[in-house]
Amino acid sequence: MTARKHLVSVAAAGLMAVAATATTTTAFADNFNLRIAAGHPAAPLATVNQLNKTLVPNVTKRVAAETDHTVRFIEGYGGTIANLFEVLESTQKGIVDIGAMCSCFEPTKLFVHNLNYFTPFISGDPKIMGPTTRQIHEEFDYFSTVFDQYAQTYVGGGAFDDYGLGTKFPWTKMEELKGVKIGAAGPNLPWLDFAGASKVQTNLNEVYNALQSGVYSGIVIFPAPYFGFKFGEVAKYYTTMGWGSVLAYPVTVNNKTWAKLPDDVKKIFLEEMQVYQTAVEDEGVEKYTSALENLKKQGVTVRDLGSEERGKMALAIEPWVNEKAAEYEAQGFPGKATFNRLMELAKENGATPVHEYTIK
């Protein structure tokens, strides 16, 4: 069963529930207050920013204009309703109706959604990796059904721009990172093992102080939040690594909430999720270039890793990529087929990987 069919079946079940209650709760059915939450703040991060700028206003306007219903969103970003580690559980419990969560902070429960972290160096373009990964989600329905046990319906997500490395010191060869403490979040921590660095688990909300105080001397991050959070004030060097764009910020709806929404509201919501996804990736591309320029203006030294060093790192990490594919298999998911199909689709969509992994 494809992810799309899974969504349709869940929606159909929801319509039956709405029909059963419509005659007695018409006033309730006409007006919906929906709590939407993300652990990160909006402005620096496209995946959250476009909830506020695109999804919420578009759904609100269209529901009012095209249906007999109204929708009012109660927005809670930056941990005001649920923090980075609480969004999945809060959506499951119904504290949140619509949750946007980084799967990087759910390495066990949302293991499968960290697919792009497990296959670095394919492409740093979110306009390639976003559509590619969403097609993978369509072809392999376990990306949707994994949310069943958490009482949620997966409705999509947009891809980040390319990951890079900000440091407090200049460097050119990966050997220079040996033993250096570098912060990263969850599934991208192992990238540092193959660069020889000493990894430190962290999150965006604590990076500035950690860099400033010397808890670590570098951070794995894309340039837009590096500039937006002003990390360049305390770490003056940024290297474009080419680790890749990732789709790892799934948006879900609590199943009870989804069941209460009429079919015309659901239709609008799913259509506007498509618009949201494109907006996230458009913002990512735009901010990637502008953020690098802004970092230079901020006094940060910006450089590219270079194809030779990038190729060395990709080759070194290949055994780990195979290990992750095997972990999917061990959990009952077709990891080898998924990883191979991801690389195949990415190339069809325009990716030129620095190294093509052999998944055994």
Annotate each predicted stretch with a short phrase:
Residues 21-29:
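Sec/Tat signal peptide C-region and signal peptidase I cleavage site
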Residues 1-14:
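Bacterial N-terminal signal peptides that target proteins for export
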Residues 4-5, 19, 32:
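Absolute N-terminal positional cue centered near the fourth residue
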Residues 128-143:
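Signature of the catalytic double-stranded beta-helix
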Residues 28-128, 145-360:
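N-terminal secretory/targeting leader peptides
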